[in-house]
Amino acid sequence: MQEKPTTVAAYAAGASLAAVALFYVFGPNYTIDGDEAGGNRKKSIVGLSNPANDCFINSVLQALAGLGDLRLYLIRELHRRELDGPEIYNQLPGPEEADQLREKRPDRIRELQQGTITRALKEMLDRLNERPIYKKTISARAFIQALEFAYRTRISRNQQDAQEFLQIVAERLSDEYHAGVKARQRAEKSIEFNPYQEREEAPSEIEVRLDDGTENGLPAIIDTKLKEIDNEYGFPFEGKLESQIECQFCHYKYKPNQTSFVNLTLQVPQRSSTTLNACFDGLLKTEYIDDFRCDKCRLLHAIEVKSNALVKAGSATDRQRLEAEIEKIQLALSSDPENALDGVTLPPAELAPKRRIARHMRITVFPKIIAIHLSRSMFDRSGSTKNAAKVAFPERLPLGGILSQKWFKLLAIVCHKGSHNSGHYESFRRNHLYPPYSTPSVFSSYAQSRAASENPSRVASPRLPASSSSTEPPALNISPPASTSTNSPLSLTPDSPSRPPSATDLKSPRPTTSSSRVSFQSTHSSSKQTISPTSAARNSSSLDTARLSSPASRSSLAERNASATDTEASASASLASRIRRRRKTADRWWRISDEKIKECKTSDVLGMQKEVYLLFYEIEKSGS
């Protein structure tokens, strides 16, 4: 019976809708994560509205949205607070600990422990990292309100500084992180010193066995005290600077002084052009300072004065007093010249000699994300002006010594156009897609998950020899007819003569620990290939004979070899195209000016030497 045209059309429409639905379900991000150059639709990201001179806020938030380690920290920190429960972070510290805190009010301390700004920033960055189909603009008002409530003040919109806003946000995040760490430590101490809680003593050592191929394995011991190691990752913006003073006369080195930082301020020299490394040299290079009164030199001067007074002392009491003071000063010189001396009268500080000192500065703890502020302010009698020097900055920044060198990758910058008192901020952020939004191999990931195990069994599974068929004709006398087969791999080659199975062949080997741990997929795939070695040998012999005797078979073999060569060439070409596509994706940047967004390249970003104001570098992981 002939079907109606309407029925055929309905069937076709239903099949098309089903195909579209399958593509939408199983590959939702394929059009997003694939090669954007192939599509006509222009991709973009979420912009921020600017109702009242909010460009300094928008530029910093867009730059923070492009930092993967920051987003990872926010997710981990909030998830940890949810797992611990609100009761840990609602508990206030004791009076002794509260006196040492910078914040004294109980409600402020509780907000720090709860991480209010951490949660608000995560929600803000999650919204900025969406991939909209069409142009989308949101407001940062919710985050600004949370920040204003945390500081109990209003953020003015009258030409504010982006670096000041970044400093406020970063310091607040750092304070919330350290408050959460102290709250967790306080909760652990309360559990340890709880006399009413019965705890079972866990063994300090656990005996395990490592798989080394033998039957019983290799005995080993794991120390459970490794679990006590603190697994704190730290705030990604926080690093430590160490400064040390050395006297150039007596060569005494003061105790190093460590300070924490959430961003580094580098002074831009007053010249037409410079480099970022030159700005770092201004911070980390050795600085020489004159007219400094060294503590050790002051003690040496005191010994000299006391010794002269001892020579001129007339009474025994004065002589004993001076000898005791000289002894104390000598003890202080050998132990610690910086500590104050009790019971010793030193000469006036104005009489102490002035020395030349060297001040060394270095970064001892590198942050995961280093935020660099290029200070372009110049002050004179008439007022302040902007330093418009060109600062060349690299895409990969090396920091540290030769033995402990760290490499950082540029992820975002904030630029300022205008004068010192007015202008506009815009940001550049690298076009990165972080999980769970990034699925560049939607369809290949399933095929890769079905791949066989990389560790096959060392010993083949025991199986009985296959019986030969009596009706099988000989293969043109090229190889003797295989009457029986063995488990040896030699029976799979057509050139090897078959032999009767021996008792050793029929004996099944004893499986070891490692050989029994084989995935189901590898066993299943290997069983398909080794079901019948006898039939495989007969088929191989007959196929090789047919190929040798038939010219058509030889031509078809040549065609197959040519097609295999073409397949390999196409595979290598596709691999090269994927590499080029990956390089092209890494070269993409977003140029964001409030709600206006457009794409640019790395060369465009590195060319913003006159306008660059803030730089965000992320430390490179090993193997990246």
Curated annotation (Swiss-Prot):
GO terms for cellular component: cytosol; nucleus. GO terms for biological process: protein deubiquitination; proteolysis; regulation of protein stability. It is an enzyme of class 3 (hydrolase). Pfam families: UCH (PF00443). InterPro entries: Papain-like_cys_pep_sf (IPR038765), Peptidase_C19 (IPR050164), Peptidase_C19_UCH (IPR001394), USP_CS (IPR018200), USP_dom (IPR028889). Disulfide bonds: none annotated. Residues 479-496, 546-573 have a biased composition (Low complexity). Residues 46-620 form the USP domain. Keywords: Hydrolase, Protease, Thiol protease, Ubl conjugation pathway. It catalyses: Thiol-dependent hydrolysis of ester, thioester, amide, peptide and isopeptide bonds formed by the C-terminal Gly of ubiquitin (a 76-residue protein attached to proteins as an intracellular targeting signal). It comes from the Eukaryota. The keyword Protein biosynthesis does not apply. Its EC number is 3.4.19.12. Residues 518-544 have a biased composition (Polar residues). Residues 453-573 are annotated as: Disordered. The active site is at C55 (nucleophile), H424 (proton acceptor). GO terms for molecular function: cysteine-type deubiquitinase activity. Belongs to the peptidase C19 family. This is Ubiquitin carboxyl-terminal hydrolase 16. The lineage of its organism: Eukaryota, Fungi, Dikarya, Ascomycota, Pezizomycotina. The gene is ubp16.
